[in-house]
Amino acid sequence: MASGLIGRLVGTKPSKLATAARLIPARWTSTGAEAETKASSGGGRGSNLKTFQIYRWNPDNPGKPELQNYQIDLKDCGPMVLDALIKIKNEMDPSLTFRRSCREGICGSCAMNIDGCNGLACLTKIQDEASETTITPLPHMFVIKDLVVDMTNFYNQYKSIEPWLKRKTPASVPAKEILQSKKDRAKLDGMYECILCACCSTSCPSYWWNPESYLGPAALLHANRWISDSRDEYTKERLEAIDDEFKLYRCHTILNCARACPKGLNPGKQITHIKQLQR
């Protein structure tokens, strides 16, 4: 259904997802139990060592989550945060669990919080000037294991807006393409590019406090994408379906969503457009 679904789950079994889910605390600190693991090249002459503090929680041994330190030589690592995670998993700690797939900012699988900002690990460069980088799961989501969060509610909200073309007029010729002008096609720019990574929704305070009732920036952006599509004939019904004080109007245009989007989209702008159509 969504591009993020193709991201493979590294190091855990899908059958344990539902039972292993746990909510990541809004605020927490590492404990004295955190371990420090050094690369074999650590301390070597001419090395450029950097510490990565990574959120760890294992459903098979439940307890308080902690930050675990890993030190790697940046001279022996790719430039992106995902490169560091893959290096840690392949060479230092195979138990580290995270999602990833395309490595090109297309699938949205590797969304996580890096130094306090949501983003894609494959598009986030390692900051050379900082001695440490802290990596945690997307905030206010149920954690399955380590950096893997449960996306079930997020995808259900996306599904609820019926993200597909709906027609009332039967096609004159079966399977015939429904055309639209270049001008109408251009109206979809800034919406169709969404990769459903959830960086925007999990950066939104309104979504944090109303995750079951507020649809969130991503789902509402897609709602406007179909509301704005000249080929769709259910505009009125789509607007009525989300005309709700919680589904739509929990958005207070804080615009954390726009700042977090790795594709440079502005969900807040699209939500404002929906509100204007509701008047």
UniProtKB/Swiss-Prot annotation:
Pathway it acts in?
Carbohydrate metabolism; tricarboxylic acid cycle; fumarate from succinate (eukaryal route): step 1/1
Q: What is this protein called?
A: Succinate dehydrogenase [ubiquinone] iron-sulfur subunit 1, mitochondrial
> How are cofactors bound according to the entry's free-text note?
Binds 1 [2Fe-2S] cluster. Binds 1 [3Fe-4S] cluster.
The protein's job, in short, is: Iron-sulfur protein (IP) subunit of succinate dehydrogenase (SDH) that is involved in complex II of the mitochondrial electron transport chain and is responsible for transferring electrons from succinate to ubiquinone (coenzyme Q).
Q: Which residues form the 2Fe-2S ferredoxin-type domain?
A: 52-141
**Protein residues bound to [4Fe-4S] cluster:** C194, C197, C200, C261
Membrane topology recorded in Swiss-Prot or TrEMBL: Peripheral membrane protein
Q: Which residues form the 4Fe-4S ferredoxin-type domain?
A: 184-214
Residues annotated as binding a ubiquinone are W209
Q: In which residues is [2Fe-2S] cluster bound? A: C102, C107, C122
For this UniProt entry, the molecular function terms from Gene Ontology, in alphabetical order, are: 2 iron, 2 sulfur cluster binding; 3 iron, 4 sulfur cluster binding; 4 iron, 4 sulfur cluster binding; electron transfer activity; succinate dehydrogenase (quinone) activity; succinate dehydrogenase activity; zinc ion binding
Q: Which residues bind [3Fe-4S] cluster?
A: C204, C251, C257
* UniProt keyword annotation of Transcription regulation present: no
Origin: domain of life: Eukaryota
Q: Which Gene3D superfamilies match?
A: 3.10.20.30, Alpha-helical ferredoxin (1.10.1060.10)
